């Protein structure tokens, strides 16, 4: 994916956030599927590292997606036990809080207002630095992100109902759709924001590719693109 390659080479923390977010989502899925505590503690650890990297979004995505996932499965009790795990909270606090405590001690209220309120809440409430867009701002970006395998992505959405019936695939769909919806509603829009949900879509495309692998024509756009490069 060209956008993923570009963000991987950009001088920003977004590639690291995407990596840590993907790791936290994977461990969260494993915990709610296998109910083994090591996966839950891994989720807290990766979320804490993501929180250090880019802030609250690293916590919001796994918390929101797992909540919706558990509500749909009628397992809100399991979600509550996971989110409020004392050991998990301790792991998160030991990793993430010291830096924020030090920054708050140095800068006081200015750090809280600037980092949390302005650059997180403020970005959602309205456009900053002219980065606005319509509700469908991310649609062409997603289409570009899945090129040259656009046909596979489209087929995933055509077979949406089938994937929705499978618990793992539903989790991946929720991951992608939550990020897409959240940032589509955000006042500030930047192209790379939607990348935080694309791993979920990419994994669904990989599943579809296993079914779709006999249709060799799907690789023609990829060969043309790499030939031009």
List where the protein language model places each region.
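Membrane-integral, polyisoprenol-dependent glycosyltransferases
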Residues: 1-217
């Amino acid at each position: 994916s060209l956008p993923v390659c570009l963000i991987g080479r950009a001088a920003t923390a977004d590639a690291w956030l995407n990596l840590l977010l993907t790791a936290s989502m994977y461990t969260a899925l494993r915990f709610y599927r296998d109910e083994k505590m090591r996966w839950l503690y891994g989720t807290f650890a990766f979320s804490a590292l993501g929180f250090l990297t880019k802030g609250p979004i690293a916590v919001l995505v796994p918390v929101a997606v797992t909540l919706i996932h558990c509500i749909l499965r009628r397992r809100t009790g399991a979600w509550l036990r996971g989110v409020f795990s004392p050991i998990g909270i301790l792991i998160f606090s030991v990793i993430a809080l010291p830096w924020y405590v030090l920054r708050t001690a140095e800068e006081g209220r200015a750090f809280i207002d600037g980092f949390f309120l302005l650059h997180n809440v403020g970005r959602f409430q309205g456009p900053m630095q002219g980065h606005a867009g319509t509700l469908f701002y991310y649609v062409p970006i997603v289409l570009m992100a899945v090129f040259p395998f656009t046909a596979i992505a489209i087929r995933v959405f055509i077979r949406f109902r089938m994937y929705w019936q499978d618990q793992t695939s539903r989790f991946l769909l929720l991951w992608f759709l939550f990020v897409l919806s959240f940032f589509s509603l955000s006042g500030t829009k930047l192209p790379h924001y939607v990348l935080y949900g694309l791993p979920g879509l990419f994994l669904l495309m990989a599943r579809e590719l296993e079914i779709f692998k006999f249709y060799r024509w799907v690789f023609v756009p990829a060969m043309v693109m790499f030939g031009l490069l």
